[in-house]
Amino acid sequence: MRTEIFSILTAFLLVCGCNSGSRTEGTAAVSLDGTETESAEILPITGTFINLPYQDVRNKYTNPQHLDCTDPSLWTAKVARMKKVGMEYLVFMSVANEETSYYPSKLMDWHYPDWRKSPVDAIMDAAAEHGMKVFMSTGWAKDQDDNLRDPKIKGRQIEMMTELAGLYGEHPAFYGWYLPVEDCFGPVLTDYAVEAVNALTARARELTPSAKIMISPYGIFNSDFEDPRYEQQIARLTVDIIAYQDEIGCVRERYPLTRLRGNWKKLRAIHDKTGI
Protein backbone atom coordinates (compact mmCIF):
# COMPACT_ATOMS: atom_id res chain seq x y z
CA MET A 1 0.00 0.00 0.00
CA ARG A 2 1.49 3.31 -1.02
CA THR A 3 0.99 6.09 1.52
CA GLU A 4 1.30 9.59 0.11
CA ILE A 5 2.35 12.43 2.40
CA PHE A 6 0.19 15.54 2.47
CA SER A 7 0.77 18.73 4.43
CA ILE A 8 -2.12 20.67 5.94
CA LEU A 9 -1.60 24.41 6.14
CA THR A 10 -3.29 26.46 8.85
CA ALA A 11 -5.37 23.44 9.83
CA PHE A 12 -7.64 23.44 6.80
CA LEU A 13 -5.57 23.73 3.59
CA LEU A 14 -4.28 20.59 1.96
CA VAL A 15 -1.14 20.24 -0.12
CA CYS A 16 -2.26 17.45 -2.41
CA GLY A 17 0.79 15.44 -3.46
CA CYS A 18 -1.23 13.11 -5.68
CA ASN A 19 -1.87 15.91 -8.17
CA SER A 20 0.44 15.61 -11.16
CA GLY A 21 -0.95 18.75 -12.78
CA SER A 22 0.51 22.23 -12.69
CA ARG A 23 3.87 22.49 -10.96
CA THR A 24 6.14 25.49 -10.79
CA GLU A 25 9.89 25.26 -11.22
CA GLY A 26 11.68 27.65 -8.88
CA THR A 27 15.13 29.01 -9.68
CA ALA A 28 16.03 29.25 -6.02
CA ALA A 29 14.49 28.55 -2.65
CA VAL A 30 15.05 30.72 0.41
CA SER A 31 15.87 28.90 3.63
CA LEU A 32 14.59 29.90 7.04
CA ASP A 33 17.77 31.88 7.77
CA GLY A 34 17.30 33.91 4.57
CA THR A 35 19.98 32.23 2.44
CA GLU A 36 19.27 30.82 -1.02
CA THR A 37 19.31 27.07 -1.42
CA GLU A 38 19.14 24.67 -4.33
CA SER A 39 16.25 24.95 -6.78
CA ALA A 40 13.13 23.04 -5.75
CA GLU A 41 9.81 22.11 -7.27
CA ILE A 42 6.88 24.04 -5.86
CA LEU A 43 3.63 22.13 -5.52
CA PRO A 44 0.45 24.22 -5.58
CA ILE A 45 -2.22 23.86 -2.92
CA THR A 46 -4.95 21.88 -4.65
CA GLY A 47 -7.27 20.88 -1.82
CA THR A 48 -9.11 22.20 1.20
CA PHE A 49 -11.15 20.98 4.14
CA ILE A 50 -14.83 21.91 4.39
CA ASN A 51 -16.17 22.64 7.85
CA LEU A 52 -19.97 22.42 8.11
CA PRO A 53 -20.83 22.78 11.81
CA TYR A 54 -19.99 25.85 13.84
CA GLN A 55 -18.41 24.16 16.86
CA ASP A 56 -16.79 26.92 18.87
CA VAL A 57 -15.04 30.28 18.59
CA ARG A 58 -12.11 28.74 16.71
CA ASN A 59 -14.40 28.48 13.67
CA LYS A 60 -15.27 32.19 13.65
CA TYR A 61 -13.27 32.93 10.47
CA THR A 62 -13.61 29.71 8.49
CA ASN A 63 -17.28 29.25 9.38
CA PRO A 64 -18.94 32.43 10.75
CA GLN A 65 -21.73 31.66 13.19
CA HIS A 66 -24.09 34.22 11.65
CA LEU A 67 -24.17 32.40 8.28
CA ASP A 68 -26.56 29.56 7.51
CA CYS A 69 -24.04 26.85 6.72
CA THR A 70 -26.83 24.51 5.61
CA ASP A 71 -27.91 26.73 2.68
CA PRO A 72 -27.28 24.70 -0.52
CA SER A 73 -26.93 27.84 -2.64
CA LEU A 74 -24.10 29.01 -0.37
CA TRP A 75 -22.16 25.82 -1.01
CA THR A 76 -22.87 25.76 -4.73
CA ALA A 77 -21.27 29.20 -4.95
CA LYS A 78 -18.41 28.32 -2.59
CA VAL A 79 -17.46 25.18 -4.51
CA ALA A 80 -17.44 27.14 -7.78
CA ARG A 81 -15.07 29.69 -6.22
CA MET A 82 -12.86 26.94 -4.84
CA LYS A 83 -12.52 25.46 -8.31
CA LYS A 84 -11.70 28.88 -9.73
CA VAL A 85 -8.74 29.30 -7.34
CA GLY A 86 -7.34 25.87 -8.20
CA MET A 87 -8.89 23.44 -5.75
CA GLU A 88 -9.29 19.89 -7.01
CA TYR A 89 -9.84 18.00 -3.74
CA LEU A 90 -12.46 18.72 -1.08
CA VAL A 91 -12.39 17.03 2.33
CA PHE A 92 -15.38 16.99 4.65
CA MET A 93 -14.12 17.52 8.19
CA SER A 94 -17.43 16.12 9.42
CA VAL A 95 -20.93 15.49 8.11
CA ALA A 96 -22.64 15.24 11.50
CA ASN A 97 -22.31 16.93 14.88
CA GLU A 98 -24.07 16.54 18.23
CA GLU A 99 -26.09 13.67 16.75
CA THR A 100 -27.59 15.70 13.91
CA SER A 101 -26.59 15.21 10.29
CA TYR A 102 -25.84 17.44 7.31
CA TYR A 103 -26.97 14.73 4.90
CA PRO A 104 -30.27 12.78 4.64
CA SER A 105 -29.46 10.28 7.38
CA LYS A 106 -31.74 7.59 8.76
CA LEU A 107 -29.53 7.24 11.83
CA MET A 108 -30.13 10.70 13.29
CA ASP A 109 -32.11 13.90 12.93
CA TRP A 110 -31.17 16.39 10.21
CA HIS A 111 -29.47 19.72 10.91
CA TYR A 112 -31.19 21.39 7.97
CA PRO A 113 -34.83 21.87 6.89
CA ASP A 114 -36.27 18.68 5.41
CA TRP A 115 -37.83 20.62 2.54
CA ARG A 116 -34.52 21.58 0.96
CA LYS A 117 -31.40 19.93 -0.39
CA SER A 118 -28.82 18.88 2.17
CA PRO A 119 -25.51 20.78 2.26
CA VAL A 120 -23.61 17.53 1.67
CA ASP A 121 -25.65 16.83 -1.47
CA ALA A 122 -25.16 20.41 -2.65
CA ILE A 123 -21.39 20.14 -2.23
CA MET A 124 -21.18 16.72 -3.87
CA ASP A 125 -23.24 17.80 -6.87
CA ALA A 126 -21.31 21.05 -7.30
CA ALA A 127 -18.01 19.17 -7.03
CA ALA A 128 -19.14 16.73 -9.72
CA GLU A 129 -20.16 19.62 -11.96
CA HIS A 130 -16.67 21.10 -11.70
CA GLY A 131 -14.79 17.80 -11.97
CA MET A 132 -13.58 17.86 -8.35
CA LYS A 133 -12.87 14.94 -6.01
CA VAL A 134 -14.36 14.63 -2.51
CA PHE A 135 -13.19 12.78 0.59
CA MET A 136 -16.24 11.88 2.68
CA SER A 137 -15.96 12.07 6.48
CA THR A 138 -17.17 9.31 8.80
CA GLY A 139 -17.78 11.67 11.73
CA TRP A 140 -18.72 12.92 14.01
CA ALA A 141 -20.40 10.07 15.86
CA LYS A 142 -20.98 12.60 18.64
CA ASP A 143 -18.72 15.64 18.34
CA GLN A 144 -15.17 16.79 17.59
CA ASP A 145 -13.93 14.96 20.67
CA ASP A 146 -15.05 11.52 19.42
CA ASN A 147 -13.17 8.95 21.48
CA LEU A 148 -12.59 5.80 19.45
CA ARG A 149 -11.66 3.93 22.61
CA ASP A 150 -15.42 3.92 23.17
CA PRO A 151 -16.95 0.98 21.23
CA LYS A 152 -20.18 2.96 20.79
CA ILE A 153 -18.34 5.83 19.10
CA LYS A 154 -16.40 3.53 16.80
CA GLY A 155 -19.56 1.56 16.05
CA ARG A 156 -21.49 4.70 15.16
CA GLN A 157 -18.73 5.89 12.81
CA ILE A 158 -18.89 2.53 11.04
CA GLU A 159 -22.69 2.81 10.84
CA MET A 160 -22.33 6.28 9.36
CA MET A 161 -19.75 5.03 6.85
CA THR A 162 -22.11 2.26 5.75
CA GLU A 163 -24.96 4.71 5.32
CA LEU A 164 -22.79 7.25 3.50
CA ALA A 165 -21.40 4.59 1.16
CA GLY A 166 -24.97 3.72 0.20
CA LEU A 167 -25.81 7.35 -0.47
CA TYR A 168 -22.61 8.58 -2.12
CA GLY A 169 -20.38 5.60 -2.94
CA GLU A 170 -21.36 5.75 -6.61
CA HIS A 171 -21.50 9.54 -6.80
CA PRO A 172 -19.18 10.90 -9.53
CA ALA A 173 -17.50 13.28 -7.05
CA PHE A 174 -16.81 10.60 -4.42
CA TYR A 175 -13.08 9.91 -4.27
CA GLY A 176 -12.40 8.50 -0.84
CA TRP A 177 -12.80 8.66 2.92
CA TYR A 178 -11.47 11.00 5.55
CA LEU A 179 -11.31 9.15 8.87
CA PRO A 180 -11.51 11.77 11.63
CA VAL A 181 -9.24 9.83 13.99
CA GLU A 182 -7.17 12.90 14.73
CA ASP A 183 -4.95 11.37 17.35
CA CYS A 184 -1.58 12.76 18.41
CA PHE A 185 1.66 11.70 16.71
CA GLY A 186 3.68 12.87 19.69
CA PRO A 187 5.68 11.23 21.03
CA VAL A 188 4.40 8.23 18.98
CA LEU A 189 1.01 7.27 17.56
CA THR A 190 -0.89 5.21 20.13
CA ASP A 191 -1.88 1.59 19.66
CA TYR A 192 -5.55 2.39 20.09
CA ALA A 193 -5.38 5.05 17.36
CA VAL A 194 -3.72 2.63 14.92
CA GLU A 195 -6.28 -0.06 15.74
CA ALA A 196 -9.20 2.36 15.37
CA VAL A 197 -7.91 3.62 12.02
CA ASN A 198 -7.35 0.11 10.71
CA ALA A 199 -10.80 -1.06 11.84
CA LEU A 200 -12.45 1.82 9.97
CA THR A 201 -10.19 1.24 6.97
CA ALA A 202 -11.14 -2.44 6.81
CA ARG A 203 -14.82 -1.54 6.63
CA ALA A 204 -14.15 1.16 4.04
CA ARG A 205 -12.31 -1.36 1.83
CA GLU A 206 -15.32 -3.68 2.02
CA LEU A 207 -17.80 -0.94 1.11
CA THR A 208 -15.76 0.98 -1.47
CA PRO A 209 -12.72 -1.05 -2.59
CA SER A 210 -11.32 1.58 -4.95
CA ALA A 211 -11.67 4.58 -2.61
CA LYS A 212 -8.63 6.36 -1.19
CA ILE A 213 -8.47 6.54 2.61
CA MET A 214 -6.96 9.50 4.46
CA ILE A 215 -6.21 10.43 8.06
CA SER A 216 -4.86 13.67 9.51
CA PRO A 217 -3.10 13.23 12.86
CA TYR A 218 -1.57 16.14 14.75
CA GLY A 219 1.40 16.62 17.06
CA ILE A 220 4.51 16.34 14.88
CA PHE A 221 5.98 19.23 16.88
CA ASN A 222 6.69 16.87 19.79
CA SER A 223 7.14 13.65 17.83
CA ASP A 224 9.97 11.39 18.95
CA PHE A 225 11.40 10.56 15.53
CA GLU A 226 14.30 8.65 17.10
CA ASP A 227 12.01 6.18 18.88
CA PRO A 228 11.84 2.99 16.75
CA ARG A 229 8.14 2.73 17.63
CA TYR A 230 7.44 5.95 15.70
CA GLU A 231 8.33 4.31 12.41
CA GLN A 232 6.74 1.01 13.45
CA GLN A 233 3.37 2.62 14.16
CA ILE A 234 3.35 4.36 10.78
CA ALA A 235 4.16 1.03 9.10
CA ARG A 236 1.13 -0.57 10.79
CA LEU A 237 -1.35 1.89 9.27
CA THR A 238 -3.39 0.58 6.33
CA VAL A 239 -4.48 3.96 4.92
CA ASP A 240 -3.48 5.48 1.59
CA ILE A 241 -2.81 9.07 2.67
CA ILE A 242 -1.48 10.70 5.82
CA ALA A 243 -2.19 14.43 5.87
CA TYR A 244 0.18 15.60 8.57
CA GLN A 245 -0.98 18.73 10.36
CA ASP A 246 1.87 21.23 10.39
CA GLU A 247 -0.07 23.19 13.05
CA ILE A 248 0.89 26.61 11.72
CA GLY A 249 -1.56 29.00 13.35
CA CYS A 250 -2.17 26.69 16.31
CA VAL A 251 -1.07 27.38 19.87
CA ARG A 252 0.82 24.14 20.51
CA GLU A 253 4.17 25.50 19.32
CA ARG A 254 5.15 29.17 19.37
CA TYR A 255 7.45 29.10 16.35
CA PRO A 256 6.47 26.04 14.26
CA LEU A 257 8.27 27.11 11.09
CA THR A 258 11.71 26.91 12.69
CA ARG A 259 11.54 23.10 12.82
CA LEU A 260 9.01 22.35 10.11
CA ARG A 261 11.43 21.68 7.25
CA GLY A 262 13.51 19.35 9.40
CA ASN A 263 10.40 17.50 10.54
CA TRP A 264 9.25 16.96 6.96
CA LYS A 265 12.69 15.56 6.07
CA LYS A 266 12.50 13.08 8.94
CA LEU A 267 9.01 11.99 7.93
CA ARG A 268 10.06 11.60 4.29
CA ALA A 269 12.95 9.37 5.35
CA ILE A 270 10.64 7.23 7.48
CA HIS A 271 8.18 6.75 4.63
CA ASP A 272 10.93 5.98 2.12
CA LYS A 273 12.46 3.44 4.50
CA THR A 274 9.21 1.64 5.24
CA GLY A 275 8.22 1.66 1.58
CA ILE A 276 4.64 2.69 2.28
Per-region residue spans from a language model:
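Positively charged n-region of N-terminal signal peptides that target proteins for export
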Residues: 1-5
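Glycan-processing catalytic domains of CAZymes
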Residues: 30-276
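C-terminal motif of bacterial Sec signal peptides marking the signal peptidase cleavage site
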Residues: 15-17
